[in-house]
Amino acid sequence: DELVALVRAQCQLHHDADRNAVAVIPMPSRREVWRVYYSGFEDWLRAAYWRAKEMGVPETTMKSALATLAAAGINDGDEIEVHVRAARCDDGYLIDLADEQWQAIHVTPLGWRVVNESPVYFTRTPSMRPRPVPVPIGVTHGDVGLLWQHTNIPAHSRLMVLAWLLDCFRPDTPFPVLELVGEQG
């Protein structure tokens, strides 16, 4: 099948720990990682086929090709660790910006920086939206106090809420739960 041959020539097929097929697509300025059955991969495949043949792909042909590619990734591909939005990396964490350039933010105790190609594999869901690139402190002063202007959190609870908020980005810890108690209204 032409679609399967096209993917095998341009991608690497793998699977994650849950045995979901994953395609790693090297691009000139980035690397994209899509689950085979997600719309992002199908969109990429339709565009690649259009560029190669200047033809569309019938729905039944696409479904058959995706099933074959998923089987190849699950049975022949290596298991790779795939992350959604955040991942532990060396001495810090990576946060996927979900932008068109597939950039991530590497956060360490010394600060943060934008990385163009993440050392870990990030995949995306169809509903993910891009996150803004942080503004360096030299350009504008970051002020966590602005958060409290938009929330009704008592001063004595703010440190706990801030710790909860930061821990939400750490994928290697138990998932924290914030219990908000107050009168309705």
Name every feature range the model reports, one short phrase each.
Residues D1-I137:
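N-terminal nucleic-acid engagement/recognition segments and initiation subdomains in replication
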Residues M27-S29, G111-G185:
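P-loop NTPase catalytic core of nucleic-acid-dependent motor ATPases
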